[in-house]
Regions:
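Glycine-rich tight-turn/loop motif centered on a GG-T
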Residues: 1-18, 67-79, 140-145
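Active-site beta->alpha loop and helix N-cap motifs at the rims of alpha/beta catalytic domains
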Residues: 1-33, 38-46, 55
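A generic short-segment signal for beta-strand/edge and adjacent turn/coil regions
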Residues: 3, 63-65, 88
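Short, solvent-exposed helix-helix connector turns and helix-capping sites enriched
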Residues: 10, 14-15, 64, 127, ...
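Alpha/beta catalytic cores of nucleotide-metabolism and tRNA/nucleoside-modifying enzymes
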Residues: 20-23, 28-30, 44-61, 73, ...
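A cross-domain feature marking catalytic cores of carbohydrate-active enzymes
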Residues: 35-39, 66, 96-98, 122
Length: 171
């Protein structure tokens, strides 16, 4: 529906459209505007130009998924393109997204890609503890061990108890 109406990911084909839409939205907001986009529609050839259009239009930060719209979730995140975008943006933070499943991959996006931050997507569904592991690493330099099954069960049980307290139901 969205693409058929020439919106959403379709704008990845037109940096001027990206600028225009973001500029209009930003002009009526009293809060920071952040944008997430993919590296492109079918190829990443406009990734830097699209990112610079968003920056020029006034976004406060830009997140980019390292795959094109055509790729969806196949293949691997294009780290070279993410690096080019990170280098091109000079006024706003750049947030790398895609294929970040471990502390080491988060570290790579910061150090090698040059991202200011990372965004975790699908990996969090299978490992919601990843956020804590990444935060702990960047605060201390220490990589925490993976949680044991027993630890995960304790956390799940505590979460269940809190839900029951909130909803007033019994186990």
């Amino acid at each position: 529906k969205i693409v058929k109406n020439e919106a959403g990911a379709m704008w990845l084909k037109d940096p001027d459209k990206i600028y225009s839409i973001i500029n209009k939205v930003q002009s009526v907001l009293d809060i920071p505007l952040t944008v997430k986009m993919r590296t492109g529609w079918a190829d990443p050839s406009l990734a830097v130009e699209n990112a610079l259009a968003a920056e020029a239009a006034g976004v406060s930060a830009l997140a980019m998924h390292g795959r094109t719209r055509e790729q969806m979730y196949t293949g691997h995140a294009d780290l070279e393109t993410l690096h080019k975008v990170a280098q091109a943006l000079t006024k706003i933070p750049f947030i790398a997204n895609g294929d970040i499943r471990t502390v080491q991959e988060a570290k790579q996006r910061i150090e090698e890609v040059g991202a200011d931050a990372v965004m975790i997507g699908r990996a969090a569904m299978g490992n919601p503890y990843l956020f804590n592991q990444i935060n702990h690493y960047f605060e201390t330099g220490e990589i925490l061990p993976d949680l044991t099954f027993e630890d995960k069960m304790k956390i799940a049980y505590e979460h269940l108890k809190r839900l029951i307290n909130l909803k007033g139901e019994k186990i």
